[in-house]
Amino acid sequence: MIKFNFPSVILGWTLICAFLLLPQVLKAEVPAIKPWFKQAVLLKSYQQSYDWLTPWEKREIRTQTGMALVVRLPVSENTESAETVDKQVLYLLTTAEMVADATLLEVTRKDIRQPFQAKIVLMDYAANLALLNIEDSNFWDSLNPIDWSPVKSKPKADAGNIYSLNIKSVQEWEVQSGTIQLMAVGHRRVSDAWLAVLKLSGISKSGQGFPLLQDNETVGMILEAGKGEAKAIPTQMLLEFLAHAGSGSYKSLAHRCFSWSRLPQRSTADFFQIPPELPGIWVNRVLPYGTGSDVLHRGDYLTKIGEWPLSHDGKIKHPEWGRSLFDLLFLDLLKVGDSLDLELIREGKAIVLQTRVSAYEEDGRTVPLKRVGHPPRYVIQGGFLFQELTLNYLSMWGANWRSRAPVRLRLFLEQNKTVLMDDNYKNVQGESASQNTESAPRVVLVTQVIPDEINIGYQKLSNAIVLRINGQRIRRLKDVDEAFLNPETEFHRIDFLPGSDRLSVILPVAGLKQSNQRIKNNFRIPKLQSY
């Protein structure tokens, strides 16, 4: 005879039901696709960048497709009225990579097949964000701005289930699900910016500018997706960008002012009088912008930022995301303009410095990082093409430029400070951190020599770093034209940094003007200078 143990049977059925219902309990509600289908704004950009090897020409046009999100600028009583943006009107938000160097931006609504032309209102290339406007009022009919919500970390209920859109065809859309891997600090190499970024798995068919959804709320914007993973900008950064866009004078996002490392060896700790067992990070370079640029020195040992102690690997305990790199403080806890205390060891003494949270700036470097929306700067004299060393120029060596570009040029970028050319140049560079970008010294090159009878014998010269012209030190491109106005003899003399193919060259003063005109006509160069 079979005997039933009713408590056991009841317990068993309870466990089975719980097991069957568990996926439904844990899985977040899938967002409805219809509202997004009606509100969707598709973006197509036609982009044509400059050819930095032949700076008066442009490269072939390429196209990209993605999305743009309808937004309204947040209203703040403390912000001044902006000249370029209006808080009461709607704008489109997308990535800067989608619109950089665009000759045409074509925007389409799913319910209106007619394309509209968009224009860039504001672009922050370092943060990879851009704001667009469309003048035709018909485009904005029935469109509503997105209501943003902060993204939740994985430990919170249903927080791991996130969604974005997948466009299979013009009429066939679906929602694609994924999971938050972590909130990381990403390095945007083209601008050397360290910013918060969400790393996702499972989402691979979305694109730039697509919304990121969690618990049926919009919590971010997709940066890139593919091969089963994606990256997204969280809401907090997007709202900060929009808030800055609505201010009287735009500032980029909050950023640190230094590069850092662990103490490389015990002798370094001894030299800088740092207790090696004390948690913290070693400041090995101070940038001319960002939080702490006014108070920090190279060699400082930073132990605490505000109320957050630093570990040896530069991590803090974030209240939402746990152990993270300290840059994550700028996501939601530290905003531009906030007062901030920095605790550190300097020359063996523990000190506290007061500063304010400051924003990223683009041009505070000897070698400017990638620039978009601006034509290359150049000067042509006697066929010698003078340009400033930039990341755009180095990128002309292709995707592997970090190993293919000339080593002596790459060193300037990797250190982002000049090789010691002479004592006078060193002094100028040391002062540049506290000066505006117009006075910052640059590395000026003769990138190539355009053939003409005046420069026979010099035509193989390339990538030569200019020290002086006619005895005048060259620290920026505009110095070149000024120096050519003041020859010391009947010849112009150009001196180069040792290591170039030549240490110096000469060009006759007589005939230089005629040579410039021949070169302009023969090579169809629109103008001989651009800066």
Segments the model singles out, each with a brief description of its role:
Residues 28-87, 91-92, 103-104, 128, ...:
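N-terminal activation segment of mature serine protease catalytic domains
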Residues 43, 135-145, 174-227, 232-235, ...:
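Active-site region of chymotrypsin-like
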Residues 49, 74-77, 86-174, 197, ...:
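Conserved active-site neighborhood of the chymotrypsin/trypsin-like protease fold
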Residues 55-59, 122-127, 182-197, 248-251, ...:
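Gly/Ser-enriched beta-turn/beta-hairpin loop segments
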Residues 98, 235-236, 304-343, 468-497:
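PDZ domains, with a preference for the canonical peptide-binding region formed by the helix
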Residues 140-150, 313-314, 320, 341-422, ...:
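C-terminal, low-ordered peptide segments at domain boundaries
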Residues 201-211, 261-311, 400-475:
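PDZ/PDZ-like domain segments forming the peptide/carboxylate-binding groove
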Residues 214-254, 500-531:
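C-terminal subregion of chymotrypsin/trypsin-like serine protease catalytic domains
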